[in-house]
């Protein structure tokens, strides 16, 4: 073992971490200037290994910290790494590190980076061969000089330390302390023995009276024992009887509680049924109200439809009569029109003939009148014009005017002809258009009738679907109410579960669900969602009989959360904390649970709890972790036996536990608050709620949605049909309007036709007159201008006058006749057009309208709708009647349930009264049992107070009755009163003091033996100390002589043990001969004392001659240092260490002696490591490795250097300063 490496940081001049290159296992030399830090390096090693730095005050610790430029060092450490390949240290490692760390307020040791105590370190070093009694494996600078100048007594002290006499001294001090303590105890015992002897003498005198007293007292105690024993047996019998009664009462109470719980369960079940039935009644009543409202609405619709149908039927019936009447009227109108037309046909030819004659007469009259006018004009022109030429000029002018007027007349006549022709053509065209529109009107009417029929069909279908939807709505409402009732029931069960569970746990479960919902909404951490499996309680099932024991076993572990891995739980917890959610959660990560298969006992009295649980094998680890080491046992006795035998937790079905550690827990467990039962109820309610919601969503809501879609489609169809109806009705109205307009046009054209014809006739007559005047003027042109008419012209005038008179008379007759006929025609035509034909048009229109109504579309649709509404009313009434029946039946059922509830309430009350009665009885029995137990304790106490009794006392009075016993007891008490003055405890005190005397005598003997042993031990210790000093002196003296001869060839040295005699004079013994002298002196005294030694002297000769032997004070300084070195080497050879540290031991030696010391170190380095410092080259010759210490900026540094650099360093230390 040797120092392999040293690491220093912050210690004295070593500020930065300094890792010294590994040392050689032989001789290592450190060189450096004065003050560079060599000695500090040695101090660092001594700081870790030596006792010198063991108890440091804060200011001393601060003094060891580095002080220099830069920030202050607040802590320092020194670490020594030992090569332990030889296993000298009792640690199974080739390298062992020992570090000491100090600061202003700390001082710690670390062994292989583990904190240890100072004592542990010192013990470890002592086990490796580092002796506390020989600290000279580290020789500091100046130590050689100190030893060279030390007095003899100091060397004796050194020899005693090397010999290890300190241990003997410590043990001697302990022995002296024990001896003093023993002496004190001996004195106390002597005093007690003296007092006891005096007391025993006094008690001896009181014994005689006490004997009589004891005789009667013995009898009294025997009697009292018998009395108390009889009372005790009687009390025990009563207690046994009470225990049996209590057990019976307890069993009965359990049965009553079970019956009461059954009654409560039945009552809860009945209450639930009543709630469900009331909810059902409420739903049915609500449905009935809805049905009533629907029925009222349906009745209103039916009434409207019935009135409408009646109106339509009446209208159809009326239309039929009206049609007959209209047809009859039409026929009469046609007959009258035909009659009038016939009359008109008969009158019109006459009228036309008269008119034609009249027109001819008028034309002839006009012509004759014009001709006469022309003749008169001709006669008048004779006086009018003066000449023929003037006349002709005027005639030409008149002719020109007449020609222009005639042309105008002709144009007018042509225009009227054209107008009449156009009127006739328009009439034909109008008739064609009218017929075409009439055909279109019939088509439109047919299309409207078809659309009406289709509209009513769609409407009826829509009404049927609405009725079906109303029914489904009622069903949905009923289901919703049932759903609400289920939700309320679920909330109550969840509330009960919450009440039976801690708030923090429930908050934790809610918070975990929020975290998972957050992951689902965000669509993240899918593996976390898949890796979470809920709480333990939701993942297994078992029989209800095991609920209590399972729940008691698991406790709050029922609410632990099962996850696939610790990663899943970490993710959940990170989000849990991030969202700052409340609650307490505990995870069971399946990948981290370490469960082993358990060997269960094979017995019929117990079964493994886990075998009664049903769960997914995937979660086997979690359930084995919670329930795997628990047995369900038949009874507490079995539980206790198995728990002790198999180191397993055991539990009964009632929940009484026996831990494998020995603890027993149990008592009454309220099964009504079973969390497993509550969880089962919650789960069942959730499933039922889910089924109702699924039914509601899958059936009713889907059907309602389907019907809504169909109704929407039908509404769209109805809107489309209505749009088409409006379109075709608008087209029909347009056609009718257009037909009316055409008819009016035709009538208007007929009205203007006759006036135009008369105007044409008038124009033609006027044209003839103008043409006649023109012919007359033309004939007069060129004739002679006469003042009188010619005879022929005069005759013509007379003839014309006669003709004119005749024509005027005829014309008047014709005019009268024409006016008469025209009046007839006008009256007939007016009657025809304004009355008959107009009425005929009205009749035709009414007949057309009747034909539209007579199609029966509206009536058919109304009748169909009325039948549908009647069916719905009937269905509604039937459903309402069914609801009434159901309500009656349900109310009857509620009454029956209420009666049953009353019965169960009475039964529960009876059970409760019985339980209360049993409880009171039990309390009475408990009180009585308490009193009996108290009496029992009193009897037992009194029996104990009687003290020890002879054997006869247990049997002597057993046959006596209590009366006899009390009589004898009274007699005893009377006799005992005579000895009331006697010291009752005299005998006891005598016996007690006698026993104490014996014990004290034994204790005195033991102390005497102990005192003698201590004296012997002290003599042995003194002898061993003497022998150790003698042996050590011999070894050191021998080694000193040998080492000195090697250091000083031819020289001689010896150690001298100096003694002091009784008279104060001194003697001395040298080296080897001292042993016999001491043994001789030992024969005169039983134990030789080391106190006779006063010092260790040194006698040396550097020439080897006996006569030149000198004392230390006679030597020079170098010789003293050499002798001191020889003494140190001698001590080290006597008690070798694994390594040595020498700081400038060759300082005062000359070159020759330094060489001898170097050779000595080389010899010793074969078996031990040396680390030395020097300023001389001789020590370098025996070294294996060299180190240089430099000091820069108040900081020391140590590095490996070569031998040449080391020599250069010691020869001229300024080179590497």
From Swiss-Prot:
Residues the record lists as N6-acetyllysine modifications: 105-106, 140, 1190
Localization per record: Nucleus; Chromosome; Chromosome, Centromere
A single MF term (Gene Ontology): ATP hydrolysis activity
Domain SMC hinge: from-to ranges: 530-642
Keyword Transcription set for record: no
Segments of this protein annotated with the region Disordered: 242-268, 1059-1090
Residues with PTM Phosphoserine: 787, 886, 1013, 1065, 1067, 1074, 1083
Short name of any one Pfam family annotated for the protein: SMC_N
Keywords (A to Z) from UniProt: Acetylation, ATP-binding, Cell cycle, Cell division, Centromere, Chromosome, Coiled coil, Disease variant, DNA damage, DNA repair, Intellectual disability, Meiosis, Mitosis, Nucleotide-binding, Nucleus, Phosphoprotein, Ubl conjugation
Coiled-coil region(s): 179-350, 393-503, 669-916, 958-989
Annotated GO biological process: cell division; DNA repair; establishment of meiotic sister chromatid cohesion; establishment of mitotic sister chromatid cohesion; meiotic cell cycle; mitotic cell cycle; mitotic sister chromatid cohesion; mitotic spindle assembly
Binding site for ATP: 32-39
Cellular component annotations (GO), alphabetically ordered: chromatin; chromosome; chromosome, centromeric region; cohesin complex; cytosol; lateral element; meiotic cohesin complex; mitotic cohesin complex
Modified residues (Phosphothreonine): 783
Reported modifications of this chain: Ubiquitinated by the DCX(DCAF15) complex, leading to its degradation. Phosphorylated at Ser-1083 in a SPO11-dependent manner.
Keyword Transcription regulation annotated: no
Domain of life: Eukaryota
Clinical condition linked: Cornelia de Lange syndrome 3 with or without midline brain defects: A form of Cornelia de Lange syndrome, a clinically heterogeneous developmental disorder associated with malformations affecting multiple systems. Characterized by facial dysmorphisms, abnormal hands and feet, growth delay, cognitive retardation, hirsutism, gastroesophageal dysfunction and cardiac, ophthalmologic and genitourinary anomalies. Cornelia de Lange syndrome type 3 is a mild form with absence of major structural anomalies.
Assembly and binders: Forms a heterodimer with SMC1A or SMC1B in cohesin complexes. Cohesin complexes are composed of the SMC1 (SMC1A or SMC1B) and SMC3 heterodimer attached via their SMC hinge domain, RAD21 which link them, and one STAG protein (STAG1, STAG2 or STAG3), which interacts with RAD21. Also found in meiosis-specific cohesin complexes. Found in a complex with SMC1A, CDCA5 and RAD21, PDS5A/SCC-112 and PDS5B/APRIN. Interacts with NUMA1, and forms a ternary complex with KIF3B and KIFAP3, suggesting a function in tethering the chromosomes to the spindle pole and in chromosome movement.
More details: Mutated Cornelia de Lange cell lines display genomic instability and sensitivity to ionizing radiation and interstrand cross-linking agents.
Family according to the record: Belongs to the SMC family. SMC3 subfamily.
Function comment: Central component of cohesin, a complex required for chromosome cohesion during the cell cycle. The cohesin complex may form a large proteinaceous ring within which sister chromatids can be trapped. At anaphase, the complex is cleaved and dissociates from chromatin, allowing sister chromatids to segregate. Cohesion is coupled to DNA replication and is involved in DNA repair. The cohesin complex also plays an important role in spindle pole assembly during mitosis and in chromosomes movement.
Written domain comment of the UniProt record: The flexible SMC hinge domain, which separates the large intramolecular coiled coil regions, allows the heterotypic interaction with the corresponding domain of SMC1A or SMC1B, forming a V-shaped heterodimer. The two heads of the heterodimer are then connected by different ends of the cleavable RAD21 protein, forming a ring structure.
Name of the protein in question: Structural maintenance of chromosomes protein 3
Lineage: Eukaryota, Metazoa, Chordata, Craniata, Vertebrata
This protein's encoding gene: SMC3
